[in-house]
């Protein structure tokens, strides 16, 4: 049979929302989204036709992981136009929670290549079998005020606050403002004869942004690995041993 590699992944995407309009100028929208993935990866090297398989008398692995991401958004919007003035005010919140878990097991020493599941393995790997899990969350609050006069002169101000579980509790939150202004030149009277220009706008702005990409889920904490020994063979105790595998990232901890 040789090498057998199998991968199966299932994904569930679900979303629901509620839209409330107390009066024409005011709208409230609430949205809940679920994104769940389950993946299974299995391998089998038979004990006969492959060199590595013959060396291990057959080898198999089973790796599984599940990731669930929940997002809950709430947005309140107010729009009002009066004469040549236009005003939009928006405020909202966003919450995201991610839960990840995985497990892996490897076995060897098969009597034949007919049964490839791990329950037919006569030896389970001690150092290549285990489980893992991680979780992170982020909470955000945001708002925007936009004003325009005659659809020609526009100003916008934004403010956003984000709090991430990946950062130390003492400096977990960040506030990010932004401002912009625009002039729609094509709407001015002196542009009326320039029919070859449909829309011409001059815009400038300034803002700050933040992100948590590249930061580990527990980067500000001391982390440990758990090691196991075959105590029943060596005559030792059956206690697991733990040792540090990574120091916390200094820029993410409270000093």
What are these regions (language model features)?
Residues 1-45, 54-253:
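Extracellular/periplasmic, surface-exposed regions of secreted and cell-surface proteins
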Residues 47-49:
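Short amphipathic helix-turn modules centered on a small-residue break
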């Amino acid at each position: 049979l040789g090498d057998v590699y199998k991968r199966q992944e299932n994904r569930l995407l679900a979303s629901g929302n509620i839209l409330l309009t107390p009066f024409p100028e005011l709208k409230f929208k609430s949205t809940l989204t679920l994104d769940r993935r389950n993946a299974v990866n299995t391998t089998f090297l038979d004990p006969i036709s492959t060199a590595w398989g013959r060396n291990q008398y057959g080898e198999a692995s089973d790796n599984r992981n599940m990731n669930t991401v929940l997002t809950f958004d709430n947005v309140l919007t107010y729009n009002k136009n009066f004469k040549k003035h236009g005003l939009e005010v928006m405020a909202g919140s966003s919450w995201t929670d991610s839960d990840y878990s995985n497990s892996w097991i490897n076995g060897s020493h098969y009597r034949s290549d007919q049964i490839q599941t791990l329950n037919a393995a006569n030896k389970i790997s001690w150092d290549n079998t285990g489980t893992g899990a991680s979780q992170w969350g982020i909470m955000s609050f945001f708002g925007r005020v936009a004003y325009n006069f005659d659809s020609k002169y526009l100003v916008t101000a934004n403010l956003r606050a984000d709090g991430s579980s990946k950062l130390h509790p003492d400096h977990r939150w960040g506030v990010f403002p932004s401002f912009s202004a625009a002039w729609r030149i094509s709407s001015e009277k002196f542009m009326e004869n320039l029919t070859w220009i449909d829309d011409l706008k001059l815009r400038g702005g300034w803002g700050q942004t933040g992100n948590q990409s590249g930061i580990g889920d527990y980067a500000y904490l001391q982390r440990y690995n758990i090691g196991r020994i075959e105590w029943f063979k060596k005559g030792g105790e059956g206690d697991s041993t733990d040792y540090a595998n990574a120091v916390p990232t200094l820029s993410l901890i409270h000093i």
